[in-house]
């Protein structure tokens, strides 16, 4: 790297970025009574974070498109990205006759590459790890992994080991952000992921993971933000209106210092 290029990199380097992670419940309220994806998009846009980690987002659903008048003509993740997040990646986890759903990542930074890792254990629950490499200005690579793990503890433990295997293949000095719905109500993930260098933002700041489910009366700590080679600040659980009525999970918002 030439001195001029180095100076340019230092001037334009990004040292902080904001993220949001939310299980969208496929765009419906808790008991599937209303389709509220347009309202969710408005709320997410107001925060204007650099990264958005989405779980349970539809790529397509033919019968819903016929039933709900506000159903978008594009995949849900594209509808949510709109003009705010020019880059997005989608990892299809479940496919059925009417359509599909999975994880998605919205980014204000270029996505250099992405891959969806199938971590389903058996045929009952389709789960995935959506891994993306981001072109964030600075001296280190930034990797993001959007996670949705299974409902059974022994499935989750196997999936956490698969996540650690994925992370072991990344550059040792890369900044790594892992966020999503871990379904880890028994709080077993922290110890497993500490072995591969991750720390959980809310646990480090407050001594315990954030309670995020159900959104209206959060009792269970299902959602997480884990980091490696970077630090989390201003960690918040968004439990007030409108968030408490936009999904069955309360979103988590964090500022990451690279």
List where the protein language model places each region.
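Active-site regions of metal-assisted phosphoester/phosphodiester hydrolases
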Residues: 1-51, 82-83, 87-258
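Short loop/turn segments at strand-loop or loop-helix junctions that form parts
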Residues: 22, 55-58
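Short, flexible/disordered intra-domain loops and linkers
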Residues: 29-34, 60-73
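Short active-site-proximal "capping" loops at secondary-structure junctions
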Residues: 57-62, 95-96
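Extracytoplasmic small-molecule ligand-binding "clamshell" domains
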Residues: 75-76, 80
């Amino acid at each position: 790297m030439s001195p001029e290029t180095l100076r340019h990199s230092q001037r334009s380097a990004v040292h902080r970025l904001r993220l949001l992670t939310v299980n969208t419940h496929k765009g419906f309220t808790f008991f599937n009574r209303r389709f509220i994806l347009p309202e969710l998009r408005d709320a997410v846009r107001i925060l204007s974070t650099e990264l958005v980690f989405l779980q349970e987002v539809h790529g397509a659903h033919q019968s819903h498109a016929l039933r709900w008048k506000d159903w978008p003509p594009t995949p849900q993740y594209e509808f949510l990205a709109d003009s705010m997040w020019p880059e997005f990646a989608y990892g299809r986890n479940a496919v059925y006759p009417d359509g599909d759903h999975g994880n998605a990542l919205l980014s204000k930074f270029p996505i250099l590459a992405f891959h969806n890792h199938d971590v389903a254990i058996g045929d009952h629950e389709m789960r995935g790890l959506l891994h993306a490499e981001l072109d964030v200005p600075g001296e280190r690579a930034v990797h993001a992994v959007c996670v949705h793990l299974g409902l059974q503890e022994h499935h989750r433990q196997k999936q956490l080991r698969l996540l650690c295997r994925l992370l072991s293949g990344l550059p040792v000095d890369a900044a790594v952000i892992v966020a999503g719905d871990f379904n880890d109500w028994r709080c077993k993930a922290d110890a497993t992921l500490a072995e591969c260098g991750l720390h959980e933002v809310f646990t480090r700041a407050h001594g315990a993971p954030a309670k995020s489910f159900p959104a209206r009366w959060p009792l269970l700590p299902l959602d997480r933000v884990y980091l490696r080679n970077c630090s989390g600040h201003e960690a918040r659980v968004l439990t007030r209106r409108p968030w408490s009525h936009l999904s069955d999970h309360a979103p988590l918002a964090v500022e990451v210092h690279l």
